[in-house]
A protein has these predicted regions:
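Positively charged n-region of N-terminal signal peptides that target proteins for export
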Residues: 1-4
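Bacterial N-terminal signal peptides
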Residues: 8-16
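Amphipathic alpha-helical repeat scaffolds of TPR domains
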Residues: 20-28, 54-76, 100-120, 145-163, ...
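Helix-turn-helix repeat elements of alpha-solenoid scaffolds
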Residues: 29-45, 78-94, 125-135, 167-176, ...
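Internal amphipathic alpha-helical repeat/solenoid segments
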Residues: 37-59, 63-65, 70-77, 81-85, ...
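Alpha-helical junction/boundary sensor with strong preference for TPR arrays
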Residues: 43-50, 67, 93, 100, ...
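TPR/TPR-like (Sel1-like) alpha-helical repeat modules
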Residues: 127-134, 169-181, 215-232, 251-278
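Solenoidal tandem-repeat scaffolds enriched in leucines and small polar residues
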Residues: 160-164, 172-180, 206
């Protein structure tokens, strides 16, 4: 009898394993940027195959994610088509949250809204900023998701884009951008993330002396901030103090200026690209822009 029960248990596990949706193909195809339309079409088919709310949520947030890329691929002149895709992506994220609340759904909801806002123009989409911040707080605090480069990048771009009177903050943006760079997965390049941080630093333009002082202040605030991850990571630049050395240089943060570090970051991003065996179309576009900035900032 025990043997029969064991056999039935093994059989049940095998059946469940077969029945469970396999996202390996769509995730690999998405990460390699091979064919976003194929990813979209495959996920639409998988949606009808999803048996549980958990599976539906997994399909839906991935649909939301690929809508961002599909919208980005359209020409700037195709604004209505872009708006439609970003709105579709937001709708998928909302459905994912309804099916089974999860960090990725909140993240890609914000990513779609953010792209919608960038397309519309920041001054025409200010009312979306605070709801985005609240959703991203859910990612960092309710789900304690601190290793999502995309989440930190979205926060960085949001705080960098907003005027100060509407909640923008260049220092918070740089801290979030540093967190985004520090959490880039090993299987992607994300040159645009490095470029974003470099551009923010170049624009801030602090001297080495000022950096040493201000990063020291941030370190104190980082240590004292206990209310939320969202608030704490606004001081991430000072997490390890002015003597910290980021991955792209052996020079201490307090011993170089913003613009010196910005150039080093771009050269590091260039090296990451050169070392990679596979490049997406987005990687190639970022590489060209990075090379142009290196040439401009080196003169």
């Amino acid at each position: 009898m025990k043997k029969l029960v064991s056999m039935l248990a093994v059989l049940l596990i095998a059946v469940l394993a077969i029945a469970a949706l396999d996202f390996t193909f769509v995730d690999d195809t998405y990460n390699k940027d091979i064919d976003d339309q194929k990813v979209y079409d495959t996920l639409k088919g998988m949606l009808s195959e999803a048996k549980t709310n958990e599976e539906k949520a997994e399909v839906l947030w991935r649909l939301s994610r690929v809508c961002v890329d599909l919208g980005d691929e359209l020409d700037d002149g195709e604004k209505n088509a872009k708006f439609a895709l970003y709105e579709e992506g937001e709708a998928y994220a909302l459905q994912s949250i309804e099916a089974n609340p999860n960090a990725m759904a909140y993240l890609w909801k914000c990513a779609n809204i953010g792209r919608w806002g960038q397309t519309k123009g920041i001054m025409n989409s200010l009312k979306k900023a605070d709801p985005m911040k609240e959703d991203l707080k859910v990612v960092t605090d309710r789900f304690n998701c601190l290793d999502s480069s995309e989440c930190w990048y979205t926060l960085a771009i949001l705080f960098d884009s907003l005027p100060g009177v509407f909640g923008g903050d260049s220092n918070f943006a740089i801290s979030y951008a540093r967190a985004a760079c520090d959490t880039i997965p090993s299987y992607v390049i994300y040159g645009g993330t490095y470029k974003a941080l470099a551009e923010m630093l170049y624009k801030r333009d602090w001297s080495a002396k000022k950096r040493a002082t201000e990063i020291g202040k941030m370190q104190t605030k980082w240590s004292k901030e206990t209310k939320s991850n969202y608030a704490k990571y606004g001081y991430y630049e000072g997490a390890n103090g002015a003597d910290a050395t980021p991955i792209w240089t052996k020079t201490k943060l307090g011993s170089m200026s913003d613009r010196q570090e910005a150039l080093v970051i771009l050269k590091y991003a260039q090296a990451v690209y050169d070392a990679a065996k596979y490049h997406t179309d987005g990687d190639e576009d970022n590489y060209e822009e990075i090379q142009e900035l290196i040439a401009e900032w080196s003169t």
